[in-house]
Amino acid sequence: GGVLEDLSTPPPEDMWLKVKSIEDAKDEAEEIKITFENGDPIAVDDESLSAAEILKKLNLIGGNHGIGRIDIVESRATGMKSRGCYETPGGTILLKARRAMESLCLSRDEIVKKDSLMPSYAKLIYDGLWWSNDRVSLQKQIDNFATKVSGSVVIKLLKGNVISLGKESKNSLYDENKASFEESGGFSNQDMQDYIKAVSYTH
Protein backbone atom coordinates (compact mmCIF):
# COMPACT_ATOMS: atom_id res chain seq x y z
CA GLY A 1 0.00 0.00 0.00
CA GLY A 2 0.94 3.62 0.36
CA VAL A 3 3.68 4.77 -1.99
CA LEU A 4 3.65 1.44 -3.85
CA GLU A 5 0.15 2.10 -5.14
CA ASP A 6 1.52 4.95 -7.28
CA LEU A 7 3.11 3.10 -10.19
CA SER A 8 5.03 6.18 -11.29
CA THR A 9 6.96 6.18 -8.01
CA PRO A 10 9.87 3.79 -7.42
CA PRO A 11 9.79 1.70 -4.25
CA PRO A 12 11.59 3.36 -1.32
CA GLU A 13 15.15 2.11 -0.99
CA ASP A 14 14.68 1.04 2.63
CA MET A 15 11.96 -1.37 1.54
CA TRP A 16 14.54 -3.74 0.04
CA LEU A 17 15.96 -5.95 2.77
CA LYS A 18 18.01 -8.61 0.95
CA VAL A 19 19.13 -7.13 -2.36
CA LYS A 20 21.51 -4.19 -2.51
CA SER A 21 21.00 -1.40 -5.00
CA ILE A 22 23.15 -1.46 -8.13
CA GLU A 23 25.04 1.52 -6.72
CA ASP A 24 25.82 -0.29 -3.45
CA ALA A 25 26.41 -3.73 -4.95
CA LYS A 26 29.91 -5.20 -5.07
CA ASP A 27 32.23 -3.68 -7.65
CA GLU A 28 34.12 -6.94 -8.20
CA ALA A 29 32.63 -9.79 -10.22
CA GLU A 30 32.21 -13.19 -8.59
CA GLU A 31 32.13 -16.58 -10.30
CA ILE A 32 30.33 -19.59 -8.85
CA LYS A 33 29.71 -23.13 -10.06
CA ILE A 34 26.28 -24.70 -9.62
CA THR A 35 25.84 -28.45 -10.07
CA PHE A 36 22.54 -30.06 -11.03
CA GLU A 37 21.34 -33.65 -10.85
CA ASN A 38 18.02 -34.66 -12.42
CA GLY A 39 17.09 -30.99 -12.63
CA ASP A 40 17.77 -30.21 -8.96
CA PRO A 41 20.67 -28.09 -7.70
CA ILE A 42 22.86 -30.23 -5.45
CA ALA A 43 26.09 -28.26 -4.97
CA VAL A 44 27.67 -24.81 -5.10
CA ASP A 45 31.39 -24.66 -5.88
CA ASP A 46 31.54 -28.45 -5.44
CA GLU A 47 30.15 -28.23 -1.90
CA SER A 48 27.17 -30.56 -1.55
CA LEU A 49 24.24 -28.78 0.07
CA SER A 50 20.52 -29.30 0.59
CA ALA A 51 18.12 -27.33 -1.60
CA ALA A 52 17.34 -25.00 1.31
CA GLU A 53 21.04 -24.44 2.03
CA ILE A 54 21.74 -23.68 -1.63
CA LEU A 55 18.94 -21.13 -1.79
CA LYS A 56 20.11 -19.50 1.44
CA LYS A 57 23.69 -19.30 0.17
CA LEU A 58 22.69 -17.89 -3.22
CA ASN A 59 20.32 -15.41 -1.60
CA LEU A 60 23.26 -13.97 0.32
CA ILE A 61 25.68 -13.99 -2.61
CA GLY A 62 23.16 -12.64 -5.11
CA GLY A 63 21.86 -9.98 -2.77
CA ASN A 64 25.38 -8.56 -2.37
CA HIS A 65 25.61 -8.27 -6.17
CA GLY A 66 22.29 -6.45 -6.57
CA ILE A 67 20.59 -9.46 -8.15
CA GLY A 68 16.92 -10.32 -7.79
CA ARG A 69 14.89 -7.16 -7.29
CA ILE A 70 11.52 -7.51 -9.03
CA ASP A 71 8.96 -4.70 -9.36
CA ILE A 72 5.95 -5.82 -11.41
CA VAL A 73 2.24 -5.31 -11.95
CA GLU A 74 0.57 -8.70 -11.56
CA SER A 75 -2.91 -10.19 -11.74
CA ARG A 76 -4.13 -11.64 -8.45
CA ALA A 77 -6.22 -14.82 -8.25
CA THR A 78 -9.28 -12.56 -8.28
CA GLY A 79 -8.14 -10.96 -11.55
CA MET A 80 -7.41 -7.63 -9.86
CA LYS A 81 -4.19 -5.88 -10.88
CA SER A 82 -1.75 -4.99 -8.13
CA ARG A 83 1.88 -4.02 -7.75
CA GLY A 84 4.27 -6.61 -6.43
CA CYS A 85 7.81 -5.97 -5.22
CA TYR A 86 9.85 -9.08 -4.53
CA GLU A 87 13.41 -10.04 -3.67
CA THR A 88 14.58 -13.33 -5.16
CA PRO A 89 18.37 -13.30 -5.59
CA GLY A 90 18.79 -17.06 -5.18
CA GLY A 91 15.86 -17.85 -7.43
CA THR A 92 17.14 -15.53 -10.15
CA ILE A 93 20.57 -17.19 -10.15
CA LEU A 94 19.12 -20.71 -10.12
CA LEU A 95 16.76 -19.93 -12.99
CA LYS A 96 19.62 -18.66 -15.15
CA ALA A 97 21.76 -21.68 -14.30
CA ARG A 98 18.95 -24.18 -14.86
CA ARG A 99 18.10 -22.61 -18.22
CA ALA A 100 21.75 -22.91 -19.23
CA MET A 101 21.72 -26.62 -18.35
CA GLU A 102 18.47 -27.19 -20.22
CA SER A 103 19.92 -25.60 -23.36
CA LEU A 104 22.64 -28.24 -23.27
CA CYS A 105 20.67 -31.33 -22.20
CA LEU A 106 17.22 -30.94 -23.77
CA SER A 107 16.27 -30.93 -27.43
CA ARG A 108 14.60 -27.91 -29.02
CA ASP A 109 11.20 -29.60 -28.97
CA GLU A 110 11.61 -30.66 -25.33
CA ILE A 111 12.43 -27.10 -24.29
CA VAL A 112 9.41 -25.73 -26.16
CA LYS A 113 7.14 -28.35 -24.60
CA LYS A 114 8.44 -27.81 -21.07
CA ASP A 115 8.17 -24.03 -21.37
CA SER A 116 4.58 -24.37 -22.60
CA LEU A 117 3.69 -26.21 -19.38
CA MET A 118 5.16 -23.65 -16.99
CA PRO A 119 2.48 -20.90 -17.13
CA SER A 120 -0.25 -23.42 -16.23
CA TYR A 121 1.95 -24.96 -13.54
CA ALA A 122 2.76 -21.57 -12.01
CA LYS A 123 -0.89 -20.48 -12.04
CA LEU A 124 -2.00 -23.62 -10.21
CA ILE A 125 0.53 -22.97 -7.45
CA TYR A 126 -0.29 -19.24 -7.31
CA ASP A 127 -3.97 -20.10 -6.92
CA GLY A 128 -3.22 -22.45 -4.02
CA LEU A 129 -3.88 -25.66 -5.96
CA TRP A 130 -0.68 -27.52 -5.13
CA TRP A 131 -2.55 -30.71 -4.23
CA SER A 132 -4.79 -30.64 -7.30
CA ASN A 133 -4.77 -33.47 -9.85
CA ASP A 134 -3.84 -30.98 -12.57
CA ARG A 135 -0.69 -29.90 -10.72
CA VAL A 136 0.32 -33.51 -10.03
CA SER A 137 -0.19 -34.40 -13.69
CA LEU A 138 1.92 -31.48 -14.88
CA GLN A 139 4.59 -32.33 -12.31
CA LYS A 140 5.05 -35.79 -13.81
CA GLN A 141 5.62 -34.31 -17.26
CA ILE A 142 8.05 -31.69 -15.97
CA ASP A 143 9.95 -34.26 -13.88
CA ASN A 144 10.35 -36.43 -16.97
CA PHE A 145 12.26 -33.63 -18.70
CA ALA A 146 14.28 -32.94 -15.54
CA THR A 147 15.84 -36.42 -15.49
CA LYS A 148 18.10 -35.33 -18.36
CA VAL A 149 19.23 -32.07 -16.75
CA SER A 150 22.47 -32.97 -14.96
CA GLY A 151 25.82 -31.21 -15.03
CA SER A 152 27.54 -28.01 -13.93
CA VAL A 153 27.27 -24.35 -14.88
CA VAL A 154 29.73 -21.56 -14.11
CA ILE A 155 27.94 -18.29 -13.45
CA LYS A 156 29.37 -14.77 -13.27
CA LEU A 157 27.66 -12.25 -10.97
CA LEU A 158 28.15 -8.49 -11.22
CA LYS A 159 25.96 -5.44 -10.58
CA GLY A 160 22.61 -7.14 -11.09
CA ASN A 161 23.82 -9.34 -13.95
CA VAL A 162 23.78 -13.15 -14.00
CA ILE A 163 25.93 -14.42 -16.87
CA SER A 164 26.50 -18.03 -17.90
CA LEU A 165 30.21 -18.52 -18.63
CA GLY A 166 30.43 -22.24 -19.28
CA LYS A 167 28.60 -25.53 -18.85
CA GLU A 168 29.19 -29.25 -19.13
CA SER A 169 27.05 -32.36 -18.84
CA LYS A 170 27.27 -36.10 -19.37
CA ASN A 171 23.87 -35.73 -21.08
CA SER A 172 25.03 -32.99 -23.45
CA LEU A 173 23.40 -32.98 -26.88
CA TYR A 174 26.05 -30.61 -28.20
CA ASP A 175 28.53 -32.04 -30.70
CA GLU A 176 31.41 -29.64 -31.36
CA ASN A 177 32.29 -31.24 -34.68
CA LYS A 178 28.75 -31.28 -36.05
CA ALA A 179 28.11 -27.74 -34.84
CA SER A 180 31.28 -26.32 -36.38
CA PHE A 181 31.04 -23.65 -39.07
CA GLU A 182 34.47 -24.65 -40.32
CA GLU A 183 34.83 -26.53 -43.60
CA SER A 184 35.60 -29.71 -41.67
CA GLY A 185 32.36 -29.39 -39.69
CA GLY A 186 29.55 -31.93 -39.74
CA PHE A 187 27.25 -29.89 -42.00
CA SER A 188 28.30 -28.42 -45.33
CA ASN A 189 26.67 -25.47 -47.05
CA GLN A 190 25.12 -27.94 -49.48
CA ASP A 191 23.62 -29.90 -46.58
CA MET A 192 21.93 -26.75 -45.29
CA GLN A 193 20.67 -25.80 -48.75
CA ASP A 194 19.14 -29.25 -49.14
CA TYR A 195 17.53 -28.99 -45.70
CA ILE A 196 16.02 -25.57 -46.42
CA LYS A 197 14.67 -26.82 -49.74
CA ALA A 198 13.10 -29.89 -48.10
CA VAL A 199 11.47 -27.83 -45.34
CA SER A 200 10.10 -25.33 -47.87
CA TYR A 201 8.11 -28.11 -49.53
CA THR A 202 6.08 -28.64 -46.35
CA HIS A 203 5.04 -24.98 -45.92
Regions found by a protein language model. Name each.
Residues A29-E31, I67, S150-S152, G160-V162:
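Active-site lining segments that contact anionic ligands and/or coordinate catalytic metals
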Residues T202-H203:
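Conserved small/polar residues in nucleotide/adenosyl-binding loops
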Residues S152-I163, E168-F187:
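Low-complexity, glycine/alanine/valine/leucine- and proline-rich hydrophobic stretches
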Residues D40, C85-E87, S169-L173:
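Short, surface-exposed beta-strand-loop junctions and turns on beta-sheet-rich folds
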Residues G1-I54, I67-D71, S75-A77:
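Flexible helical/loop "lid" subdomain adjacent to adenine-nucleotide binding pockets
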Residues K81-Y126:
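C-terminal, non-catalytic macromolecule-binding modules
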Residues W130-W131, V136-A146:
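A conserved acidic, glycine/proline-rich C-terminal tail/linker
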